[in-house]
C-alpha cells in the first residue's frame, strides 16, 4: 500500500480523513482506492474535471506514469480535447445525441506526453482533427 500511496504523491497524508484533503488529494486518494486491487481495466469518468490547472497537470503525470509502468487498459471520459490527446492512445469521438462512436482517432505521439510533446505540431494537428469533428456537429 505504501508504494501505491507514494505513486500518487500522498505520502505523509495517510491518516487524514477525506474531508481533510484538498480536491486534488481526494482525486489522488480515489485513484489509489481504484488501483489497490491492481485492476487490468480502469474506468475514469471526468477524473480531472473539477481540479485547478496545476493539480490537473500533476494528476495527468501520475496517470501517465501509472499507465507506462502498469499498463492497465484505461477508459477515460473527458470533455477536454487537450486532455484526450495528451492522455490517450486512441480517442473515440461520440456524437451528441444519440451517443454513438462517430470516429476513432489513433494518437501516435511519444510517451510520456510532456510539455515538449504538447507544444509539437503533431499535437496541434490531433487537436484540430478532433475539433473539426465537433464543428461538424455544430457544437464548437
Segment roles from a protein language model:
Residues 1-13, 65:
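Conserved ABC ATPase "signature" region
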Residues 22-28:
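ABC ATPase nucleotide-binding domain "signature motif"
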Residues 56-70:
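Helical segment within the ABC ATPase nucleotide-binding domain
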Residues 71-77:
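Conserved H-loop
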Amino acid at each position: 500500500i505504501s508504494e501505491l500511496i507514494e505513486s500518487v504523491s500522498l505520502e505523509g497524508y495517510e491518516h487524514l480523513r477525506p474531508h481533510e484533503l484538498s480536491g486534488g488529494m481526494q482525486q489522488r486518494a480515489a485513484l489509489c482506492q481504484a488501483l489497490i486491487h491492481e485492476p487490468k481495466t480502469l474506468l475514469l469518468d471526468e477524473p480531472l474535471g473539477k481540479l485547478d490547472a496545476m493539480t490537473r497537470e500533476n494528476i495527468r503525470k501520475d496517470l501517465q506514469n501509472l499507465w507506462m509502468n502498469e499498463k492497465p487498459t484505461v477508459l477515460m471520459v473527458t470533455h477536454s480535447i487537450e486532455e484526450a490527446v495528451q492522455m490517450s492512445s486512441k480517442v473515440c469521438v461520440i456524437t451528441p445525441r444519440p451517443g454513438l462512436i462517430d470516429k476513432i482517432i489513433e494518437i501516435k505521439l511519444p510517451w510520456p506526453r510532456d510539455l515538449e510533446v504538447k507544444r509539437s505540431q503533431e499535437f496541434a494537428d490531433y487537436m484540430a482533427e478532433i475539433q473539426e469533428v465537433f464543428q461538424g456537429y455544430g457544437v464548437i
